[in-house]
Amino acid sequence: MTPKRHPAGPRRLVPRMARGSAPWLLPAFTAAGLAVLTSRGSRTRKALAVPVVALAAGMAWFFRDPDRGPASGRFLSAADGVVQSVDPLPDGRTRIAVFMNPLNVHVNRAPIAGVVTGVEHRPGGFLPAFDKDSERNERVIWTFDTEVGEVTVIQIAGAMVRRIVPYHPVGAKVEQGERIGLIRFGSRVDVYLPPGIAPAVEVGQKVRAGETRLDRD
């Protein structure tokens, strides 16, 4: 279930780029600028400049960070993408896994307001995020102290990822829907609903970070 969207304020003339994207964007834009400047008067150079400019444009699209309007619900999606699984766990929690493909926004958001009590980075592999062995991938494990108890969110690296970029330290207060971090390229985010909270999404459903409600009343 996706709550009604509210206006997120005036449109930006220049799209926001995600924090942590500069190491990728600066070289891409620099190369594109040089390719354009050196292509004048040469058809061959112009032809060579096209893929360089296209790559820079693709990078800008990938690292876009659009504003999202406020939405209602105890739990909102932490990621854009498609629900990969909804798994009840032995401890009573429910794990909702959202797979992000390279075309999705890769900035992740807090599913609920709270205080960050843990930000643990675990190194690992870089298997496809939909692979069953991706449980051994690099990840960042977030824990939040919230009004409904402890909530866990896990950012999981995918096949093309080489870094997860957290935005907040332990002790930080975050609002629901606030940006918490970036995963570069295709990846997955898991949200763990506490015991007694039923999921409102199903496998295959498209979700948007900070807008799609994950729980039922």
Curated annotation (Swiss-Prot):
Name the NCBIfam families on file.
PRK05305.2-3 (NF003683), PRK05305.2-5 (NF003685)
Q: Where is this site: Cleavage (non-hydrolytic)?
A: G186, S187
Where does it sit, as one GO cellular component term? plasma membrane
Metabolic or biological pathway:
Phospholipid metabolism; phosphatidylethanolamine biosynthesis; phosphatidylethanolamine from CDP-diacylglycerol: step 2/2
Q: Which organism is it from?
A: Thermobifida fusca (strain YX)
Entry cofactors: pyruvate
Record-given protein name = Phosphatidylserine decarboxylase proenzyme
Q: What kind of modification does the protein receive after translation? A: Is synthesized initially as an inactive proenzyme. Formation of the active enzyme involves a self-maturation process in which the active site pyruvoyl group is generated from an internal serine residue via an autocatalytic post-translational modification. Two non-identical subunits are generated from the proenzyme in this reaction, and the pyruvate is formed at the N-terminus of the alpha chain, which is derived from the carboxyl end of the proenzyme.
